[in-house]
Amino acid sequence: MTDDYSKLKSEIMDLVSEEFLKTKDDIISVMIENNKLKRAELVVGNDSLPPPPPTPSIVKIEHTTTTSNIDDLPLPPPIQEVEEEEPTQQNIEQQQQTQDESDDYYKTVHPLGVQDTYEDEEYFSSYSKISLHHEMVFDKRRTAAYYHAISKSKNIFKDKVVLDVGCGTGILSCFVAKAGAKKVYAVDASDMAHRAELIVQQNGLADIVTVFKGKLEHIAFPEYVDVIVSEWQGAFLIFESMIESVIYARDNLMRPGGIILPSKASIYLSPINVDSFYNQYINQWSNVFNLDMSPLIPFAQEELLEEKTIRNYYVDNQDSVLDKPIILRTIDLSTITIEDLSKTVKTFEFQVPNGSKYHGFGSWFSVWFENLDDDDDDNDNNNNNNDNSNDDENKQQFAYYTIDRDGELVKSTYQQYSIDSKGLTPLFFKQSSNVLELSTAPGTGDQHWKQVLFLNSKEKILQSSDKQLDTTSIKGTIRILQNKDYRRHWWIEMYVSLKTNPFDYSYQKYLI
């Protein structure tokens, strides 16, 4: 018995040595053809002998990998955590196939090729902390916007299958379930997914909401979805690049004609005066309990303005904005591509009153939720407007909802809101339904994104070189590029010229 097994083992090793450049499937096939491997005829009576090799997989994945390049293969994706049962071979192969498909997707659509780790360990670790989610969930303007937008979208969610990308605590998934969704798949790659499952159970929604832990791109879902919901926005809107996962979900997981909430977004830019920042962090050294500590002011300037980008500073005074903003970048979630998003170039010209303090540029963003349900008073207005359908001035006025600084829902029209907000978030699309806007513009109310300031190294007092003009021209070009090595980050380059006497030219490069 032992001699037969040793002989068989020797023959197999000789065969493997001859065929070492062939794949595992090829080796198994050759062994079977030559009748070298007959596991059914082996009667193993020694417990120390190895068990027979496993049956080849039912699902055959074609490949050309050889022993010469096997070390170059990427590590497999993390397997979805299932506490109740061990992952099966079929599940593992399905996960590997899902990652291969996502790699093929990014290889095709991303100008930088297949996605790297995106600093995943640090990124997802930070989103496992309750303190970070406390900041987001109790950002009353942020959470109120999603709550009201979802509550007013029952016509969108009724009996639909919904995907929550980056579910965090699961709060949006619960909102969606209560709005009438048939099924909600909540996905998060951080450990917060386990806490989300507790929240879902605690609120009696486990029959509707299923939580997945893992990267969206590596999960095989049981069905396509009708609606995608996500709070993907970062500082400067696109920081963290989470929007790429939303685009992936749209292209691979959503049925044709599906809906994404929020549906549109825009970034704005304007020259800005931030005396409040200077007074709080720099000029305050001039008088401290009757002591003149002004010698520290230049050191404070050097330290605070060294990196030039000041994140998470809220500008409360709308008058700090020195001219009407430009629309720096627009995003339609139904059509935006990763390639288009990866680079933005925009020229600008602002006219700023002479004598203004100019500290640099401020940026903010807005997102919109469209196709909200009609209220009873909306229906009444629509009926009245239909009676005067030939009168352009009496055409239908869709509701325009916003969230005030206290987190309360405000109903108005865009025309009225634009006046109240001093035109800081101009629309780039034609309103054709009831809409809710969540704005991070100065003066609209604090939120955890605040604004992003691109500050000069020192304060400038503007005075036009043309004495006939009351304003000073600020011209320039801004270029936004995704960092090729750390793709959750973005480079911001600015070429700026001030029409002063003498002319002032500058180039700054910021990393966000």
Swiss-Prot record:
It catalyses: L-arginyl-[protein] + 2 S-adenosyl-L-methionine = N(omega),N(omega)-dimethyl-L-arginyl-[protein] + 2 S-adenosyl-L-homocysteine + 2 H(+). GO terms for molecular function: histone H3R8 methyltransferase activity; histone methyltransferase activity; nuclear estrogen receptor binding; protein-arginine N-methyltransferase activity; protein-arginine omega-N asymmetric methyltransferase activity; protein-containing complex binding. The active site is at residues 231, 240. GO terms for biological process: chromatin remodeling; methylation; negative regulation of DNA-binding transcription factor activity; negative regulation of DNA-templated transcription; negative regulation of NF-kappaB transcription factor activity; positive regulation of apoptotic process; regulation of androgen receptor signaling pathway; regulation of DNA-templated transcription. It is found in: Cytoplasm; Nucleus. S-adenosyl-L-methionine binds at residues 133, 142, 166, 217. It is an enzyme of class 2 (transferase). GO terms for cellular component: cytoplasm; nucleus. Residues 120-508 form the SAM-dependent MTase PRMT-type domain. It holds the Pfam family Methyltransf_25. Residues 88-99 have a biased composition (Low complexity). The keyword Translocase does not apply. Residues 67-103, 375-395 are annotated as: Disordered. It comes from the Eukaryota. Arginine methyltransferase that methylates the guanidino nitrogens of arginyl residues in some proteins such as histones. Belongs to the class I-like SAM-binding methyltransferase superfamily. Protein arginine N-methyltransferase family. This is Protein arginine N-methyltransferase 2. The gene is prmt2.
